[in-house]
Amino acid sequence: MNSMKFPLLDRTTQSSVISTTLNDLSNWSRLSSLWPLLYGTSCCFIEFASLIGSRFDFDRYGLVPRSSPRQADLILTAGTVTMKMAPSLVRLYEQMPEPKYVIAMGACTITGGMFSTDSYSTVRGVDKLIPVDVYLPGCPPKPEAILDAITKLRKKVSREIYEDKIGSQRENRYFTTNHKFHVPKSHVGRSTHIENYDQGLLSQSSSTPEIASENFFKYKSLVPNYDMN
């Protein structure tokens, strides 16, 4: 199961000596030693938890779940990412050592899912916060699909060049989502917020111990004054 074709490895010479490069050797060593950081916020994470059991046995891929981002090289986001949790997710990603990879699991993580229509607190895709290597659609994806995503990621690792991976880090995207809510007649007289969010993701240094949420999202709230009597 762990066998992987290694395209960059040179053929064995007549003297039975295998010649390769340091980059190829590094990629080969990381194929069966991916240490994931499990970032589960919703029901998709239950499907990933089933991989730990004996039926699917993800240990055969060399996956060792870690609880610290400083010891992980893969973060698997499963579930809805809210704007309140976005700074924490970016901070976890920045604390991971290079090279690092991201698997976006589930429709809610990739596009916001059913919450993307008119939700004031849902991020429309985790790729607006961190770069994604493998997209895994589904609601929720099956455990077999997760294993297929891990296999595709391992193929990508076997073919990449370390210097290119470091140099091609994508910058955080900027996006704006406007929400306009109308006050229902049954709520007239109550305190209601009509919020217009201008969300700009600001690049932060990985050495920053704490990243405040106000550095990521700027809120412009218009609060109408109603008679509370």
Curated annotation (Swiss-Prot):
Quaternary structure and partners: NDH is composed of at least 16 different subunits, 5 of which are encoded in the nucleus.
Taxonomic superkingdom: Eukaryota
Keyword Acetylation: no
Cross-referenced Pfam families: Oxidored_q6
PANTHER family per record: NADH DEHYDROGENASE, NADH DEHYDROGENASE [UBIQUINONE] IRON-SULFUR PROTEIN 7, MITOCHONDRIAL
Cofactor info, note text: Binds 1 [4Fe-4S] cluster.
PROSITE patterns per UniProt: COMPLEX1_20K
Record-given protein name: NAD(P)H-quinone oxidoreductase subunit K, chloroplastic
Matching Gene3D superfamilies: 3.40.50.12280
Annotated GO CC locations: chloroplast thylakoid membrane; respiratory chain complex I
Signal peptide: none
Gene that this polypeptide is encoded by: ndhK
GO molecular function, one term: NADH dehydrogenase (ubiquinone) activity
SUPFAM superfamilies in alphabetical order: HydA/Nqo6-like
